[in-house]
Structure formats: C-alpha cells, structure tokens
C-alpha cells in the first residue's frame, strides 16, 4: 500500500518541480528578451541585474507591489517593460528571476500572490496609489 501511495505522489512532486524549473527558465528568457536592454546596462537609471544595493529598496516594497507597479509602468519604466504583448504571468516570472538574482528570494506567484498582484494593478489603474 505504501508503494502504491508513493507511486501516486511521486508524479505530483515531479510535476511541481518541473513547473518551477519551467517558470524559472521562462523568467530568464523574458528577462533576456525584454528586460535586459535596460536592466542589463542601467539605462535611464534602471537598477542593474544583480545590483543588490539598488534592488534592496525595491524588493522591500514586496512582490505584489513591485510587480504590479512595474507592469503598469513606474519611475521611467514603460508599461510591460515596453512589450505590449507581455502577459502579467510572463512579466511576474521575469520579476522573480531578476529579484532572485539581485538579493531577493521570491517564489513564482501562486494563485494568492497573483490575486494580490492583480488587485494592486487595479488600484494603480484607478489612480488611487502612487509609487
């Protein structure tokens, strides 16, 4: 019975693990294709990838706030990083990738975090909150 239970759980564990790996690769790819042009070089004072000192105050804003504000456009950054076709999911994966390589330790957004990001986006769209 234990072996049968284990054989049922094992695929789920691998599915979660591979999903996280795929999200990390997706975040890295989005970073390279969209974000690196500015965050790789520091253009227009964009915090450079890996610069822990520059990223620390942004990371301190929290995952939902930073992701939503950046997706909406903030501090000279264009909405969606300048790619009008970039989904919030793809953008969120890229933010996690950047943050985790710049001093943070964020997880790929789950349903609860995605809801918090979307709620913060709605607040930004309504113009009731300024960064």
Show where each model-derived region lies:
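Bacterial N-terminal signal peptides
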Residues: 9-17
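Bacterial N-terminal signal peptides that target proteins for export
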Residues: 1-10
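Short, solvent-exposed mixed-charge patches
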Residues: 129-131
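Gly/Gly-Pro-rich "capping" loops immediately C-terminal to redox-active cysteine motifs
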Residues: 40-69, 78-81
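Sec/Tat signal peptide C-region and signal peptidase I cleavage site
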Residues: 17-24
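Axial heme c-ligation environment in periplasmic c-type cytochrome domains
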Residues: 69-93, 98-121
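Sequence context surrounding c-type heme c attachment/ligation sites in exported
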Residues: 25-36, 56-68, 85, 107-108
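The canonical Cys-X-X-Cys-His
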Residues: 31-41, 94, 98
């Amino acid at each position: 019975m234990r072996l049968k239970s284990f054989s049922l759980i094992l695929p789920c564990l691998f599915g979660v693990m591979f999903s996280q790996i795929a999200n990390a690769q997706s975040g890295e790819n989005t970073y390279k294709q969209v974000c690196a042009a500015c965050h790789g070089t520091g253009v227009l004072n964009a915090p450079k990838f890996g610069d822990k000192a520059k990223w620390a105050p942004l990371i301190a804003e929290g995952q939902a706030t930073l992701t939503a504000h950046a997706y909406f456009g903030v501090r000279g950054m264009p909405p969606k990083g300048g790619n009008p076709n970039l989904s919030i999911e793809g953008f969120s994966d890229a933010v996690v990738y950047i943050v985790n390589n710049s001093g943070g330790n964020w997880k790929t957004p789950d349903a609860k975090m995605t809801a918090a990001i979307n709620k913060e986006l709605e607040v930004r769209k309504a113009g009731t909150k300024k960064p």
